[in-house]
Amino acid sequence: EHDLMYPPDPGEKTGSLGGNVSTNAGGMRAVKYGTTRDYVLAMTVVLPNGQILELGRSVTKTSSGYSLLHLMIGSEGTLGVITELTLKLIPNPKEDISFILPFADIDAAISAVPKIKLAGLSPQSIEFMERDIVDSSANYTGNKIIPTVIDGKEAGAYILVTLDGNDQDEIFQRAETLAEIGDEIGAYDT
């Protein structure tokens, strides 16, 4: 309705915001947007002794001593039960595009990640997938979406990169740069 999003999108869609905050979850978009901690402005917490604390403020910057708010984030319920949250939302990017970069093996895929991050592409997410996962998914769904042999070469691992933004042309420019980087770092079929 307001075209806003909560960036630390947890992979588990049945998860709660309280659980998300209790574990300081990051989700796939943490690469670009950070983790839950970056989006919690305030919370109400019930301590084990029954005391109710109102922590934080509905503004981003505060400097009034220790941050009990940030101590609660990621404490997994050991310090108290979160009953209310005030979260920061950001404008939802209008466009996104995802790429699967296949590599010969796990080492090649893993070594590609820092190069992609350092290229200034500002990826929304970078995910690693082993060949076994791709094969298992294809067997389970009966649909082989991701190729395992590219130009006669076996892919042993994959990197899934998502780029997002508000300007489609700018995203396509970053996508071209990603394809060039893919060629330089040994990705198949970029």
Which residues fall in each region the model found?
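Noncatalytic alpha-helical scaffold of FAD-dependent oxidoreductases
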Residues: 1-190
